[in-house]
Amino acid sequence: MRHDHIISAKQLSRGDIETVLDHAADIAADPGAFADRHSDTLLGLLFFEPSTRTKMSFTTAMKRLGGDIVDMGSVESSSVKKGESLADTVRVVEGYTDALVLRHPMEGSAKMASEFVDVPLVNAGDGAGQHPTQTLLDLYTIRENAGFDDLTIGIMGDLKYGRTVHSLAHALTTVDASQHFISPESLQLPRSVRYDLHEAGAGIREHTELDDILPELDVLYVTRIQAERFPDESEYREVAGQYQIDGDTLAAAKDDLTVMHPLPRVDEIAHDVDETTHAQYFQQAHNGVPVRMALLDLMLGGDQ
C-alpha cells in the first residue's frame, strides 16, 4: 500500500481490509513495538471542516509511530481565507510533509486533491461523499465484537447525507454482510450508493421502523441527522429526533447486540444505553488510533 492514496472505501478489497485490521490488532496488542517506526515522518493535516475524533486520532497515531504533524489550523487563519484554491494549498503543504490527511466540505475534493500531489493522501471526509478511515475502524470494531461470519447489521439514521454510511455500506459487501437500512423516506440512501451496492451484488433492505428488524440484528449502527448538510433548515426540522433508542428500545434486541455510532451523537442514543453491554461507540472511537496507525504505517512503507 506504499504511496497509495486512500480516497474511498470502494477501492479497498477484502484482502486490503483484512491487512489493515490485522495490522491494527498487532499494534493494539503491543503499541510500543511501533513507537519509532516513522521517527522522521511529518503528517500534514488539512481540515476545512470541524473535527474532534478524526483529527485527534490521526495526530495521536502519527505521534505514536514516532512522527509528528503539521497542522494547517483553521480555515480562518490560513491563505484559504484569501482565496487560495484547494489545488494550490495541497501542492504547497505537500512540500512540507510526507503524507496528507484532508477533510473538505466538497464531495469529490479528496479525489481532485490527490491528482495534484505525489505524497500519500488520505480522505478524512469529503462532504457527503466518503470517509474510508472511519469505515476501517468501524469494521475493526465489528470484527472484534460480532465477527464477519453471517453478520446482520442495521444502519439507521441519516443515510442520505451520512458519508460514514456510504463508505461502510460498500465495504460491508466485501464481507457478505446482510445489511438493513432504517431511515425516513426522505433520508434513504442516495442513488449513487444504491447503484454501487447493486453493482456489488448486495441487496438493499429498507425499513422505516427499527422494530421491524431489531431482533435479528448483530450490530446496530446509529448515525445522527446531519443538520449542516440540509439545504433547507425546515427539511431538517421535519426529521430531527425521529430515530432515538434507549434502554427500553433494546429490550427486544439480542443479548449480544453491538450498538455503534461514528459520533458525535445528538439525541439519537439515550445516555442510559452507555451503561449497557451493547454500547461500543466509545471503544469504536478509541479504535481509531491503532487502525489509523496501521494504515499510515502500511502507506508509508511498513513491513506488514
From Swiss-Prot:
Could you say which EC number(s) this protein's record lists? 2.1.3.2
Question: Which residues of the sequence carry a binding annotation for carbamoyl phosphate?
Answer: R53, T54, R103, H131, Q134, L263, P264
UniProt: L-aspartate binding residues = K82, R163, R224
Instruction: Name the keywords, alphabetized.
Output: Pyrimidine biosynthesis, Transferase
InterPro entries linked: Asp/Orn_carbamoyltranf_P-bd, Asp/Orn_carbamoylTrfase, Asp/Orn_carbamoylTrfase_sf, Asp_carbamoyltransf, Asp_carbamoyltransf_Asp/Orn-bd
Q: Which reaction does it catalyse?
A: carbamoyl phosphate + L-aspartate = N-carbamoyl-L-aspartate + phosphate + H(+)
Q: What name does this protein carry?
A: Aspartate carbamoyltransferase catalytic subunit
Tell me what organism the protein belongs to: Haloarcula marismortui (strain ATCC 43049 / DSM 3752 / JCM 8966 / VKM B-1809) (Halobacterium marismortui)
